[in-house]
Amino acid sequence: AKRADIVVFLTGTNYEKPADHHTGTESHDRWIISLPGNQEDMLKALYEANNNTVLVLETGSSMDISWAKENVPAILEAWYGGQAQGQAICDAIYGDINPSGKLTSTWYNSIDELPKGTDSNFDRDGRNGMMEYDIDDWGYTYMYYGKAKHGRQAAKPLYPFGYGLSYTTFEYSNLTAPANITKDDIINITATIKNTGTRDGAEVVQ
């Protein structure tokens, strides 16, 4: 690693092994959101040997990669990309394509920031212990995450819902939206998006 120009470290979770408690599937919830095994230790060792390290994540959901965010210069989330994933990753790293994806979930700093399913505070309507999951009032998920609610301290996510970088930059202008709407209205929102960088790219408007 010390002699390499760039170190590319591919890591993540194994969708075939949900029993490791790091991987969520249709029938298994995760207990842990850190990288399985000694993968973070390996990443730290590689980074110590060569600071010019690229972290490529192959995961099915959000992970606690707070150390990597603070230290690793480049992070690419590849998800489970299928048989052409290798070529797509290489194209993105070499700059042959410009990534434009955005996160579809909030990424947290640690497991401690997630609510417990057994938390009695969720039983807000007294229906025999059934969980009443109100994302607005309790402030646990994506756009509501970060509010101080019910004794819970305000927090800042590791990466917010909709986060994503590009090799270029975009400028938003001329935003128009209706001032008044009623139930069942069709809402038309328009904006002008300008690529202000030097590379071709696509933008997800949000």
Which residues make up each language-model segment?
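Secreted, periplasmic, or luminal enzymes acting at the cell surface/secretory milieu
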Residues: 58-202
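Hydrophobic helix-and-loop "lid/oligomerization" segment in the mid-to-C-terminal part
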Residues: 1-70
